[in-house]
Amino acid sequence: MRFRIVTAAVTWLACGSLAIAAEPAPLSQEQLAKAIKIDSLTIPTPGELFAALEKPGKPDWAGQYRTPIPMTYRNRAQIALNLGGLIADGFIAVEAQDSQQVKNIGTDIIKLAKALGVSENVLSRGNSINEFAENSEWDALHEELEATQNEVKTSMQSHQDQDLVILVSLGGWIRGTQAVSAAVIKNFDEQSAKVLRQPAVVGFIHSKMNDISAELKSEALVKSVNDQLANMEKLVAFQTGKGPTLEEVKKLNDAVSKLMDEIQKKEDAK
């Protein structure tokens, strides 16, 4: 059986523009044609990314679940980062075809989105997520999650919260990378691990983080995350044409797991 691996950029549907020279994505021409483009950077949609890597066997997606995170964050930057991570969790639950987990994650997504003051359009999607999960409509759930994250970002932009849009995307990238690297470690082969090579994407994220307001950039959590991106870029810059070694994937997983723990820690960023 062949399966799809959730890739590290699972929720990186960035809203903004910055031209960089991106490396070719490991996708077919048809998949690339469907990708979302931001100037010269091509960002594949989650569906295309899931199809980018296939290998025998079925992953234990339920094994990539994490314990529920707090829903009582007060700091908006921390909420945005965790919202991105939750959206990635939603895609993982869909891959696991776990209706109850999808509903649980969907409820939490709406709670954090509401804390950021998003539009009623976003909040109403909670019912759709529950309905599709109840009926095991996995393709529809994929589309609904993508629509939800896009509406979250659109709503933030309309409220002049572009900086928070970046943080939502970053939170999704970190959580997605954690899940993918863990899945690769569990059943390692070099070909599958190549999906983790994405220095252009990390460089793009880092450049967008440098564009956020000085006030937000000075917050302890945001500063820590931004400082660690330089190391992340090195960890995903494997030799061209070769996949990473198991040890390299483990180092990447350790780094993103540590960062994810910092993001979801209950103490609010100051």
Region spans (language model):
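Sec/Tat signal peptide C-region and signal peptidase I cleavage site
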Residues: 17-23
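Extended amphipathic alpha-helical interaction segments
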Residues: 133-218
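N-terminal Sec/ER secretory leader and immediately downstream segment
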Residues: 23-130
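Bacterial N-terminal signal peptides
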Residues: 8-17
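Short, charged, amphipathic alpha-helical segments
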Residues: 103-107, 127, 167-170, 192-199, ...
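Secondary-structure edge/capping motif, primarily at the C-terminal ends of alpha-helices
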Residues: 90-97, 116, 120, 155-159, ...
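A cross-kingdom marker for long, charged
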Residues: 214-270
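Positively charged n-region of N-terminal signal peptides that target proteins for export
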Residues: 1-5
